[in-house]
């Protein structure tokens, strides 16, 4: 998962990474203005609101209920109402170009990101208005920063708003199951539930932190990033983005404004201390207060205590501090073990350790000063510089009254400290530098400060100073400032040389092995990029190629050292073959510890006493060379200089004792840099130090490939992907295969048996065995090889019995089309034929054609009159027309005089005449005769239209074929060539009987105009096309034309029904006669339909009952009406009754299912018998039963005789019920049809075979079955049923 943008808080827009910066900027601006105590009550509450607002943005669920906002928020200036796309543009505009910017709060945090943010007052506006936020904060009000999105209330804090929104339960439908909190969106509820369940799937790869949301992980990852390229020009603080820096700059601007205001108020009011809350009436008192209580923050404080980091302004204050705070402490000399009771004695004693001035020494600072100056930071920039000829140091200022100048008139040097991050270099003490680093450069990473004596790292400069003063006070040596010196001293022996080339040759020969060759060149070569020195040019070239990846860098030639020039301090490694030269002893020592561990010092021809002391395990001391002027015969003069420090000794014993001190220093116990614990060996130190850096984490290892995973889910996924194999199991032989191809080959070889099917070429029947085919040929084709099967109706012969049966079905088609010579055996087929071929959308007009006599006239009222005459004639012969399903009066047909096409509505005929013959409504007979005169000779056999040419007829025939019909009826699925014909067809689906009444409000409709107006009164909101529907049949209309056609159709039916009830036909009602007793009934549902010799007959319930009991053998004449009522018996139970009323009451009480037809007097022709009985049919043998118990007994007999298994003879598949077998045979019938199943009677399409089976059982009866068995009276809907029946029942 494109990813959804997280929503920002509604009222405040704080960009990522700067929420904490903004809060710090606000706090600093408030603190600069004098803190909260000097503010009004409204200011304090507003600041608390902003603090709450900034703190809420860092919570896990600060954006839960907020909706998605736009990708870019708009920043609006409150003075000129100009919009900006970013906070930086708005800040620049407010600072330089806004004409209305005043001294008020810029209100940069008041972003118009919510719809109501422009209408809500900012915190400064509330302050200016003097709002009272303390009254009813939780109840809310108007004009506050956090408005409710559901009502008009607003609140000063976001927490109050969240609590208030929970009362709108109707607007928050999603509820947390753990804490019952409500949410507006489901995604917010799901995000909140993760806080309860602890589902944190986003893990940080730097630490063990985990988060439930990816944006929280991104914010957390910024804490691991140390790059902050954007720095503040005021305080040098770094930021990760420009927006964070600009937001931070607002704090300086506010601070400046608050300071300006405080200065204005200071002229009128008291003076307040910037470091505490004390106020003073005069400036002198404030300065005295700062010097007394805050001396470390004063610019005049430059005297530092030698015991603690406090600084003081004058000497008297410093001495008073030492006597009060450090009176009981003994003051030790850092150079020797002597102790003194006063500081003055220590300073006087330190003069004895200073070396006298000579031509080969520069002026050395005080040893204590040297111990401070010898401390260096790990970074190259944090260094201490010694200024010659400057004022005395702060540590020497207490001795100004005793000895300020040396005997030779030279002043002591002053040590000053520089900041490694800015250009400020005038810090007089370490304490002042530390304060500067902690206040101005607090965002910088913490650096370690390394001691040059023991290489220990300290967190601060003050700790380094205390470390040198306490641990190395007996071995501290001053930093010497060398002047004009021309002698070069060897690091490993007391010899001195006049030039650097001689020194390098001496190191090669004497200290790099007995067989070492002297270098070819006489000069040293230095890299111009890193200033590293090399003895040969090839070594320098190789270094440039490897370290700086370049070949064109130029080298720095070795300077020619003259006796009058200054020296260059260099340190060479005695182990490297290219003899690199380092600029400091610290770099050389680190190089030896990293690259030459456990390597003893190189061979030397000198004695051990003349060599430098070396650490036994790791360290090799390579001290700074002592370059002294003069000859190399200083030892012969009786002076033994120490190459580790600047001391000289007059005899060899004292020199040897001094060297032992350096050796003990190098062989000291090694301390842990984390906890300062001492260890005897490096191994124990390393083992201990590993504990500080070791963290344990649980990993899950794969046993197969040894891969590690942080969670069990990752391991399981790896196992499923890499080490899981899918096996294929053969259920026939239980064999297992590792691939799909293998099991396919196995099934094809082992379990694929050939099975031959034998098909009869004459009738296309398939047989499993050759014997079955032989039996079939014997019975069907052996007797008469020629066409042995002859139709008894027409004499046509056929070669197979199946072909004869299919032909015989054409003779039983009792439904003839009145427009053409085609006949059909089902009503639904005739209706379909009329719709497709003759555009007739009602099939009720074929009543008069059942006997094969088509109508000879197309007049409007003739079919209805003929039907009325047949119904009114009491002496009419017994016929079956009145008992058919289509016995209703047919709709009036409108035929075209030119082409013979017939339509059910006059408007459809007019549309046809206009569309096909160009004859408009209302034209005279001359135009019609002219059109008839020009009628073509080519006639369409489908719709009887005529054309002048064969090409025109061919193009017309394309309209009757499938591909041209692009419009499908949504009700029945039938397709039509045009939208107009589809509209005309959809009207015929109307089943509404009350055609003149609105089905919504039951209001009668009289005309088409009233129908259209009434449809507009009941619009259909679900119809997105027109918004209307037919109020009579409730069909949805897609156009205004379709609505008008509906109106014409329903109003014509209304006119037809009113014409039938006119005085000419008043009192006439359609009656239905029983074919046996000729009794008349008002509804055709009162008659039971029977098929006798292929013709339908209607019998009443009484005649059906008597026929079932064997009482009636044929058609009996009607009983006389004046028969006495005595001797009436019940036809069901043969009980005698005295009157017809008693018999009728008995029939209704005891025989409710069947109402008998008694021989007593009838009340009239309008009495309606009871409905026909419900029957049950067996699927297996198609026998019919009257009640459910009988069919259950019958089915049980089938199960006892035949078993519960029913076999499909076409595929040999077994089923446990006949219904499932029938469904399976339906699937056989539609194999290869694309998964669709069409009803063979009404052509309704289904997607499942069982649905089609249910449809046939519910809609169609025995009379609708198509395929007849030639050997038994059973009928079937599908040919596969007939085949399966023949193969199972008549195979022998």
Curated annotation (Swiss-Prot):
Null mutant phenotype: Mice are runted and ataxic, the cerebellum is underdeveloped, and the vermis is severely reduced, resulting in diminished proliferation by granule cell precursors in the external germinal layer, especially near the midline, and abnormal differentiation and migration of ventricular zone-derived neurons and Bergmann glia. In the remaining cerebellar structures, the Purkinje cells are poorly developed and mislocalized.
Chain intervals with Polar residues compositional bias: 110-125
GO molecular function: sequence-specific DNA binding; zinc ion binding
Keywords: Activator, Developmental protein, Differentiation, DNA-binding, Metal-binding, Neurogenesis, Nucleus, Phosphoprotein, Repeat, Repressor, Transcription, Transcription regulation, Zinc, Zinc-finger
Annotated GO CC locations: nucleoplasm; nucleus
Biased composition (Basic residues): 1-11
Tissue/organ expression: Within the cerebellum, Zfp423 is expressed in both ventricular and external germinal zones. Transiently expressed in newly differentiating olfactory-receptor neurons.
Start-end of C2H2-type zinc fingers: 75-101, 146-168, 174-196, 202-224, 230-252, 271-294, 303-326, 331-353, 417-441, 449-472, 488-511, 525-548, 571-596, 640-662, 670-692, 700-723, 728-751, 758-781, 789-811, 815-838, 894-916, 938-960, 967-989, 1028-1050, 1072-1090, 1128-1151, 1176-1198, 1206-1228, 1237-1260, 1267-1290
Xref: PROSITE patterns: ZINC_FINGER_C2H2_1, ZINC_FINGER_C2H2_2
Pfam annotation, one family: zf-C2H2_6
Domain characteristics, as noted in the entry: Uses different DNA- and protein-binding zinc fingers to regulate the distinct BMP-Smad and Olf signaling pathways. C2H2-type zinc fingers 14-19 mediate the interaction with SMAD1 and SMAD4, while zinc fingers 28-30 mediate the interaction with EBF1. zinc fingers 2-8 bind the 5'-CCGCCC-3' DNA sequence in concert with EBF1, while zinc fingers 9-13 bind BMP target gene promoters in concert with SMADs.
Designated name of the protein: Zinc finger protein 423
Species in which this protein is naturally found: Mus musculus
Encoding gene (name): Znf423
């Amino acid at each position: 998962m494109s990813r959804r943008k997280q929503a920002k808080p509604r009222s405040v827009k704080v960009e990522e990474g700067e929420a904490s910066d903004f809060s710090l900027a606000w706090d600093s601006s408030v603190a600069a203005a004098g803190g909260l105590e000097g503010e009004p009550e409204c200011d304090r509450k507003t600041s608390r609101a902003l603090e709450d607002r900034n703190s809420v943005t860092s919570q896990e669920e600060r954006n839960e209920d907020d909706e998605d906002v736009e990708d870019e928020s708009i920043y609006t200036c409150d003075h000129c109402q100009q919009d900006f796309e970013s906070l930086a543009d708005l800040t620049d505009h407010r600072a330089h170009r806004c004409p209305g910017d005043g001294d008020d709060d810029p209100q940069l945090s008041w972003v118009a990101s919510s719809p109501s943010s422009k209408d809500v007052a900012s915190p400064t506006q509330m302050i200016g208005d003097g709002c009272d936020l303390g009254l009813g904060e939780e109840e809310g009000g108007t004009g506050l920063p956090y408005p409710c999105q559901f009502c008009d209330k607003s609140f000063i804090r976001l927490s109050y708003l969240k609590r208030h929104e929970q009362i709108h339960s109707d607007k928050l439908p999603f509820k947390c199951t753990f804490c019952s909190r409500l949410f507006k969106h489901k995604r917010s509820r799901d995000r909140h539930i993760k806080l309860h369940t602890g589902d944190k799937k986003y893990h940080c790869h730097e630490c063990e932190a985990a988060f439930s949301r990816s944006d929280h992980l991104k914010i957390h990852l910024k804490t691991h990033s140390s790059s902050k390229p954007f720095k503040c020009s005021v305080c040098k603080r770094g930021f990760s983005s420009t927006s964070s820096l600009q937001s931070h700059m607002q704090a300086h601007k506010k601070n400046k404004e608050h300071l300006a205001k405080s200065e204005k108020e200071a002229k009128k009011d008291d003076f307040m201390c910037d470091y505490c809350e004390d106020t003073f009436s005069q400036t002198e008192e404030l300065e005295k207060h700062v010097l007394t209580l805050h001396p470390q923050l004063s610019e005049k404080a430059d005297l530092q205590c030698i015991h603690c980091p406090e600084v003081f302004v004058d000497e008297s204050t410093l001495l008073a501090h030492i006597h009060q705070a450090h009176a009981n402490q003994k003051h030790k000399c850092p150079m020797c073990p002597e102790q003194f009771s006063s500081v003055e004695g220590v300073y006087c004693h330190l003069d004895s350790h200073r070396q006298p001035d000579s031509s080969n020494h520069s002026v050395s600072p005080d040893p204590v000063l040297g111990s401070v100056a010898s401390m260096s930071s790990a970074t190259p920039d944090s260094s201490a510089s010694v200024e010659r000829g400057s004022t005395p140091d702060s540590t020497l200022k207490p001795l100004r009254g005793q000895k300020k100048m040396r005997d030779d008139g030279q002043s002591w040097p002053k040590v000053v400290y520089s900041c490694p991050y800015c250009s400020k270099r005038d810090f007089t003490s370490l304490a002042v530098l530390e304060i500067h680093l902690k206040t101005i450069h607090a965002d910088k990473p913490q650096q370690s400060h390394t001691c040059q004596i023991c290489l220990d790292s300290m967190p601060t400069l003050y700790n380094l100073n205390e470390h040198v003063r306490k641990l190395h006070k007996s071995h501290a040596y001053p930093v010497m400032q060398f002047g004009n010196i021309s002698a070069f001293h060897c690091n490993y022996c007391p010899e001195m040389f006049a030039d650097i080339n001689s020194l390098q040759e001496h190191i090669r020969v004497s200290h790099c092995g007995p067989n070492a060759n002297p270098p070819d060149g006489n000069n040293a070569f230095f890299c111009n990029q890193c200033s590293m020195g090399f003895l040969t040019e090839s070594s320098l070239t190789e270094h440039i190629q490897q370290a700086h990846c370049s070949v064109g860098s130029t080298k720095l030639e070795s300077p020619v050292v003259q006796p009058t020039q200054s020296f260059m301090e260099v340190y060479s490694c005695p182990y490297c073959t290219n003899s690199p030269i380092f600029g400091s002893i610290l770099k050389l020592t680190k190089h030896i510890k990293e690259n030459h561990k456990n390597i003893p010092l190189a061979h030397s021809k000198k004695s051990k006493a003349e060599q430098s002391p070396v650490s036994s395990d790791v360290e090799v001391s390579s001290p700074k060379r002592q370059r002294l002027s003069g000859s190399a015969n200083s030892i012969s003069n009786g002076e033994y200089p120490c190459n580790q420090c600047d001391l000289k000794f007059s005899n060899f014993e004292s020199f040897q004792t001094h060297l032992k001190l350096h050796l003990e220093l190098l062989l000291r116990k090694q301390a842990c840099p984390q906890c300062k614990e001492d260890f005897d060996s490096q191994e124990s130190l390393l083992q201990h130090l590993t504990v500080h850096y070791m963290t344990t984490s649980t990993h899950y290892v794969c046993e197969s490939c040894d891969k590690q995973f942080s969670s069990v889910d990752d391991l399981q996924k790896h196992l499923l992907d890499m080490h899981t194999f899918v096996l294929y199991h053969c259920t026939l032989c239980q064999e297992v295969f590792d691939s799909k191809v293998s099991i396919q080959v196995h099934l094809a070889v082992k379990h694929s048996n050939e099975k031959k099917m034998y098909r009869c070429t004459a009738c296309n029947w398939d047989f499993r065995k050759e014997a079955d085919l032989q039996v079939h040929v014997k019975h069907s084709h052996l007797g008469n090889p020629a066409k042995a099967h002859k139709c008894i109706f027409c004499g046509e012969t056929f070669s197979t019995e199946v072909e004869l049966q299919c032909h015989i079905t054409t003779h039983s088609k009792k439904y003839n089309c009145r427009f053409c010579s085609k006949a059909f055996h089902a009503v639904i087929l005739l209706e379909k034929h009329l719709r497709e071929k003759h555009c007739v959308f009602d099939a009720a007009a074929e009543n008069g054609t059942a006997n094969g006599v088509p109508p000879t006239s197309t007049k409007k009222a003739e079919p209805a009159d003929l039907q009325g005459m047949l119904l009114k004639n009491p002496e009419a012969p017994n016929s079956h027309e009145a008992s058919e399903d289509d016995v209703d009066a047919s709709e009036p047909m409108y035929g075209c005089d030119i082409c013979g096409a017939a339509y059910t509505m006059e408007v459809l005929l007019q549309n046809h005449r206009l569309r096909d013959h160009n004859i408009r409504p209302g034209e005279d007979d001359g135009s019609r005769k002219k059109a008839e005169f020009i009628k073509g000779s080519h006639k369409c056999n489908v719709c009887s239209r005529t054309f002048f040419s064969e090409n025109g007829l061919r193009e017309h025939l394309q309209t009757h074929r499938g591909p041209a019909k692009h419009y499908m009826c949504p009700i029945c699925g039938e397709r039509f060539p045009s939208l107009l014909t589809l509209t005309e067809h959809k009207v015929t689906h109307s089943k509404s009987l009350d055609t003149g009444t609105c089905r919504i409000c039951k209001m009668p409709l009289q005309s088409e105009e009233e129908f259209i107006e009434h449809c507009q009164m009941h619009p259909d909101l679900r119809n997105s096309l027109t918004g209307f529907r037919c109020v009579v049949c409730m069909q949805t209309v897609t156009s205004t034309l379709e609505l008008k056609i509906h109106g014409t159709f329903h109003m014509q039916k209304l006119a037809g029904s009113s014409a039938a009830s006119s005085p000419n036909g008043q009192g006439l009602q359609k009656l239905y006669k029983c074919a046996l007793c000729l009794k008349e009934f008002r509804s055709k549902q009162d008659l039971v339909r029977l098929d006798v010799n292929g013709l339908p007959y209607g019998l009443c319930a009484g005649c059906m009952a008597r026929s079932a009991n064997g009482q009636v053998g044929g058609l009996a004449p009607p009983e006389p009406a004046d028969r006495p009522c005595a001797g009436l018996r019940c036809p069901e139970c043969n009980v005698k009754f005295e009157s017809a009323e008693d018999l009728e009451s008995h029939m209704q009480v005891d025989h409710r299912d069947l109402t008998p037809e008694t021989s007593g007097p009838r009340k009239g022709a309008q009495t309606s018998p009871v409905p026909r009985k419900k029957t049950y049919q067996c699927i297996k043998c198609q026998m019919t039963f009257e009640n459910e118990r009988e069919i259950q007994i019958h089915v049980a007999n089938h199960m006892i005789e035949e078993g519960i298994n029913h076999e499909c003879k076409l595929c040999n598949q077994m089923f446990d019920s006949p219904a499932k077998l029938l469904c399976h045979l339906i699937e056989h019938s539609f194999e290869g049809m694309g998964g669709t199943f069409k009803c063979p009677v009404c052509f309704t399409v289904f997607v499942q075979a069982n649905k089609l089976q249910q449809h046939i059982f519910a809609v169609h009866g025995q009379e609708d079955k198509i395929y007849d068995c030639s050997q038994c009276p059973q009928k079937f809907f599908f040919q596969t049923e007939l085949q399966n029946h023949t193969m199972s029942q008549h195979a022998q």
